[in-house]
Amino acid sequence: MRFAGHHGPPGHRRQRYMCVPASGEPAHRFTELLPCEESWTDACETCEREVGLHEGPHAARSYQFVARGIAESLRAVGAGSTYRDAALVARERAKRLRCDPVTGEPRFSRHGSLVMDWVEVFAPVVFEPYRPREWPTSGSLLLDDLPFRVRDPDTGRHRVAFRIFAVMGYAAGRPKLWRLEAHTSKSQVDWEAFLGALPGSPPRVVCDNDGGLVNSVRSRFPGAGLYLCEWHLRHALERLMGKIRTEGEHRDVIDELLGDIEAAFTGPTLWTPFVERAHAAGIPRLSEWLSTTGRVVEEQFGRRGQRSTRPVEMPPATSPLDGFINPIRAAVGPRAYGLKNRERTNRLLMLMQLHANRQDDDSDYVRLIRACLEANHGRPNVARRAVIDVGRIASLR
C-alpha cells in the first residue's frame, strides 16, 4: 500500500491510497473509512507527537467538516450557544467560509442550519451512553416545568407555546438532571407519558400542587411518598392574598398577614398562630384555602423533620432543581419562537442535559461520533433533515 495523491480543495485535502496486491491482482485506489483531512500543523497538541500531512482530524465521508468540529459545536449549543453563533465559530475554525460569487471574497455566514442538522443527527449519538435507564431508587425525584411564551401573529397576544418538563434526582447523594422533554401542555396525559418513559419508581416525589402533575405521579408512582413543594404552596397563598388585597375591604389585615407568610412556612410553631389569625379575619376564600391546602402544609411539617437532621436528598421544595433549569430557561427563552419541531427540540435538550450534568466533553463526543460513523461505513446512521413535521403543522405549537 502506498500514497496515491489527494482529493479535495487546498487546505482540506484528503489522502488517497493505492493497494498493490502481492498476488498480482489489479491495483486499486481507495480512501480510509473515515478519511483524514490534511494536518495544518506538524504536531498534535492532544497526543503530543509529530504528525504527517495525512494524519489530520477524521471526517465523515461526504462531510466537509471533521468530527472534532462537530463535537465542539454540539458542546457549544448544549452550553447555551445559539445555532447561528455555533455555526459561525465552526466555519471560522474549519476555514470553511463561503466565497462571494461576485467578488470571490470570503463571506461570513451565520445561518444556523449547519449546526441544527448536526444536533439532529449526532445529539442522540453522544447522549446514548449517558441516558438514564430507570428512575432513581433512592432520595427524591423533583419535578417541574418551564413554560415558554411566544407572540401569536394572528391575535398579537403572547401565549404559552410549549413547556419543558424537567426532573432532578440523586445519584450517590449528588443531584443530577435526570430527564428533559418538551410538551405542548401540562395535562395529566402528557405528564404520564413523560414519567412512563423510564421503568422503576422513586421512594419520594416533590412537585407543584398542579392537578395534572399530582394525578400523574399518583398513577405512575403509587408507592412513592408525595410531597408538595413548599415554595409553590407559599407562592399560591401569596397570590391568593394579593388578589384579596386588591378588593380593598381586607387590605389592612392582608398587609399584616403577608409579612408573616415566609416565617409561617418554617414550621408548626409559627404556622399555627398564623392560621388562627387568618381565620379570625373572617375572609371566606382565605379560610377555605387554609382548611384544604393548608391542612396539607400542616401534615407535611410532621414528615419533613428538622433542617439540621434532614438528608440533602430529602428537600421540602423543588428549589434544588432551579440550579439546573435556570440556565436552560435563559438559553431557550430568547429563541422559543423558532423552536417548532418537538423532536429536534428534544435532541437539543439532550445536549443541555449533558452540559448540566457536566458530561459534555469534546474528546468523548469525538470518540462517540467516530464510533458511530465507523459502524455505518463512514456515514451517519440517519440522514440530515429526516426529522420533519408532516403537513407543515408545527409539533410544538
Where are these regions (language model features)?
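Short, positively charged, Gly/Tyr-enriched micro-motifs
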Residues: 8, 14-139, 145-152
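Short small-residue beta-strand/loop micro-motif enriched in glycine and branched aliphatics
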Residues: 29-33, 56, 173-179, 335-337
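Short coil/turn segments at secondary-structure boundaries
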Residues: 88-91, 131-138, 289, 302-306, ...
